[in-house]
Structure formats: C-alpha cells, structure tokens
Amino acid sequence: MKLQKPKGTQDILPGESAKWQYVENVIRNLFKQYHYDEIRTPMFEHYEVISRSVGDTTDIVTKEMYDFHDKGDRHITLRPEGTAPVVRSYVENKLFAPEVQKPTKMYYIGSMFRYERPQAGRLREFHQVGVECFGSNNPATDVETIAMGHHLFEDLGIKNVKLHLNSLGSPESRQAYRQALIDYLTPIREQLSKDSQRRLNENPLRVLDSKEPEDKLAVENAPSILDYLDESSQAHFDAVCHMLDALNIPYIIDTNMVRGLDYYNHTIFEFITEIEDNELTICAGGRYDGLVSYFGGPETPAFGFGLGLERLLLILGKQGIPLPIENTIDLYIAVLGSEANLAALDLAQSIRHQGFKVERDYLGRKIKAQFKSADTFNAKVIMTLGSSEVDSREVSLKNNQTRQEVKVSFENIKTGFSSVLKQLGL
C-alpha cells in the first residue's frame, strides 16, 4: 500500500500556505475592528453536542459525520461545523454570567470534517472561519454581522457577490409555516425525491433546501414563509432590511432559503457568487436565539456566520485576484569553503536577531549555484563569505538588483544591518 493522504484531504505546501496566511491575517485584522476575540474549541465533541443542535434529520448528522466510540465507549464525533462547539463552550464556561461583557463576540478558524464527495472547494477535512455574537437581539446585530462579511469580501477584492436574505421567524411562525408546507407537499409526495419523502413529516423545511431537480420543481409554487411571520418577526425582518438599505448593502429576498441546520430562527442569509456559471455559497449564517438554552444555559439571543477557506481561496483564484504574498529575503550568504561555515552561522543568527530574513548555503555548492539560489529566493542582498573574509573580519555585500557593493566589518553587520541596507540603497 502506498502511503498517501486520505481521500478528501490536502497537503497545503509552502508557497500555497502563504496565500492561506495572507487571507487569515486579513480576516483576523477585520474581526478585530468589530471587536471579536478568538476562541479555540476541541476538534472532536460528544456526538450529542452536534446531533441535538444541528438536527437529527439533517444531512450532516444522517450522512456526513465522522463519529466513533472511543476506548471508554464514549460516542465521539469530529466537529462538522463550528457553532455548536462554541455554544457548548459558552454554556460550559458560564460566559453568560453578568460579569462577562455583552454582547460577547467570538470568532474561530479551524478544521471541520464531513464525509461527502470531494470536489473543488469542498473537502472531507475543510477549514472554516466563523463568528458568533451572544447577548443581543437588536436587528442592528444581524446587520452588523452581515456587513462584516460584506466588508471582508470588499477587502479581499472578491467580485459579483450577492446577498440572499430570508427570515424563519419565531418558533411559532415556523411551526405555522411547517404545517402549511406539509399541507402543500403531501398531495405531491410521490413527485419528491426519496430523501424528501422521508423528511416530509420529520422536517419539511429540508425539502426547500434540497438540491434534487424533482424537489426544486415541486417547491417552485410552495407557500412563502414570509406570509406566516407573526407581528414581532415581521418587525424584526423589516428592521434588518431597512438597516441594510441604509448601509447601501444590496440584497435579494430568497424565500426558499432555509439553511442546512435546524437551530436557526429569524434572519438567515447567504453570500453567493458565480464561478464558471455555477452558483457558489461563500458565507452563510443567521440568528439562533434558542441554542444556548438548548445547551442548558439561560435564554440568550445569538447571531453568527461561517465561511469555508478552501472555497474562498478557490474564488480568489478563479477571479484572478492577486494576493500580495511576500516572497523575498533580506540576505543570502554564499559560503565558500568549510572555513566560513561557523562565521556564516554566527552572522546569520546576528542578523536574524535584528529582525531580518536570512538564508545561507549549507551544501558546499559552487558559487554559481549559490547565486542562482539567491535569485530564486528573491534575495535583496548577497554576501559572499570565504576564508579571506573570515581572516579579515570584513565582507562585501551586494545589492542584488543594482549590483552596488559595500565592504563592511563583521561587527557593524552584527549590530547595525539596517544601516548596511541603507548604504546599498535599500
């Protein structure tokens, strides 16, 4: 058997990982502007944390979770999404306590796991970014969080992004709509896919979310959930729409959008873009006011979203958006002979301690090969170090672009490399 990575996983190699780091840094810096702090939760959770919150009838739980019994016979699952673990942590660590400032804003970046057919931008191990805001039922919280996603896509330069918006209303509104949907779909049950027939009485809203062609056809004339909103749900949704208008964030009201997780209520949304005539959801989320109490905490309003990093990077690549990846080093030390080995090590360490990026030759290669490496690394400066330089404790440094050279003592290099760069016009 060849030792290879498991199906649906990837190795993010040097060079490619620099793109990830750039995007993650943009995300972290933006979230700081909105006063979000990072939370890190375990990669695996008790099975019930996910199954009870995400929903027993969802595809995630019925088809996609990696779950197993550990050596203590505990039922464990690799986390398939980030919200349920964060809510579990919020309750377990009593972050709802009065001394914790509200709203409590947290974000995460980490691996998630789902057993599904691998395709571009969708792997079995994937990386998700998410934000969760606890303690505010103000519609402005919904809009600020949506605006943060919009802000991120602007910062990254992503084009043709459309915001799809809907409301699932209160639990009472949702229950009334659930019954209306059952009444509408039951007479045409046989026209639905097998999965949707099974779900019809368990959770008919899942039929709206189905990607099967027969289901899409069946729900074309289905009743709209917006017709079943109670007065307070309608007022909340109207306020969200009004605030988005005020911020000049365009949106499409999409009444067939229900999201793939069962814990949402009131506002739900997706940011969608087109790649090669295919619609891709790049960010999705909504309000989940009942989830904290479901985990044993007090009634707590909450709002959040998640987005996949693989999909985000795929879109950046497909749209030809250049990422400003720094791929230069400040100094390359060409080492001539074993006599210069220790001096090269000592100088490199001294310059690194001053905050500069340094590489050197370790392989005893010919000088031409070493200069070629310096060009490959985009070195700003080249130092050529041999036995005569070690004896004199002076060495020449060359600007790799202009070819200007200066001769500098080891002592000056070890204490003031920045002034050496200035002498070379850098």
Swiss-Prot record:
GO terms for biological process: histidyl-tRNA aminoacylation. Its main location: cytoplasm. It is found in: Cytoplasm. Coiled coil: none annotated. GO terms for molecular function: ATP binding; catalytic activity, acting on a protein; histidine-tRNA ligase activity; transferase activity. Gene3D superfamilies: Anticodon-binding domain (3.40.50.800), Bira Bifunctional Protein, Domain 2 (3.30.930.10). It catalyses: tRNA(His) + L-histidine + ATP = L-histidyl-tRNA(His) + AMP + diphosphate + H(+). It is an enzyme of class 6 (ligase). Keywords: Aminoacyl-tRNA synthetase, ATP-binding, Cytoplasm, Ligase, Nucleotide-binding, Protein biosynthesis. It comes from the Bacteria. It holds the Pfam family tRNA-synt_His. Its EC number is 6.1.1.21. PROSITE patterns: AA_TRNA_LIGASE_II (PS50862). Homodimer. Belongs to the class-II aminoacyl-tRNA synthetase family. This is Histidine--tRNA ligase. The lineage of its organism: Bacteria, Bacillati, Bacillota, Bacilli, Lactobacillales. The gene is hisS.
